[in-house]
Amino acid sequence: MPVDLTWSPLARARLEEIRAYVSLDNPAAAERLATRIVAVVEALRDYPYLGRAGAEPGIRELVIGGTPHIVHYHVRGKRVTINTVWHGAQRKEPPGRARDLPRV
């Protein structure tokens, strides 16, 4: 049975930042990338544990195949919340200081 899926304001902002950045060089590629990220995330409705366990307790990571992007999310009951979207080359804050990610 599908679960509810929501994007945090931070995740929405990060997706838009990614789209805007790629759009500087190639607007069509930016749209394709954003569409791909959203499509892969939508699979979490049916497979909420599709991603691997993350470094933070309770956080899961979904690698967007064919891109360097990783989606951080958490599952609570019948709800999946997308916390943020990272470029794989970005430096993450050390555990305990990841202010972007909710504590679960």
Positions of the model-derived regions?
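A generic local structural motif
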Residues: Y49, P68-H69
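Enriched for short, Lys/Arg-rich terminal
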Residues: H69-I70, H74-V104
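A short catalytic or substrate-binding loop motif that flags glycine-/basic-rich loops and adjacent residues
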Residues: V63-G66
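Basic, Lys/Arg-enriched alpha-helical interface segments
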Residues: M1-R60, R79, P95-R97, L101-V104
